[in-house]
């Protein structure tokens, strides 16, 4: 009888330990997923022969309100309509070095949360980080290289 009680106790303790361990792992996984969240597209940048002419064409034919940097599309966040967001559209001169080391004629900017933690996670996963995080009044930026050699810009917008 003592052996059966001991076996039941060991099995129960093992089950509860496994359950507790699984709960801890699941919570850590949720934090990792939260850390890696891309919240949207922050910008689309592309090379062209004449950025000024390109801006004028889009202004004339598609109604873009352009500046020397292209245009900025404003929108509201679905989860919190009180919060504004924006997506930048910018033509660059075909001679720009800004997209290097990528040889592509475009670069996409992704809006992210918690950039510092995301960069650490990406480093641990072996992703190439091109530069250090830079901070400006409108947010923090860093560049990475994806699996096909495309330079990607990650942007954590400044808190409003």
Regions found by a protein language model. Give the residues of each.
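Vicinal oxygen chelate
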Residues: 20-49, 68-70, 96-160
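Core segments of cupin and vicinal oxygen chelate
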Residues: 35-39, 45-90, 124, 142
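A generic local structural motif
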Residues: 30-32, 93-96
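Bacterial Sec-dependent N-terminal signal peptides
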Residues: 1-29
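Residue-level signal for short segments within beta-strands and strand-turn junctions
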Residues: 77, 93, 156-158
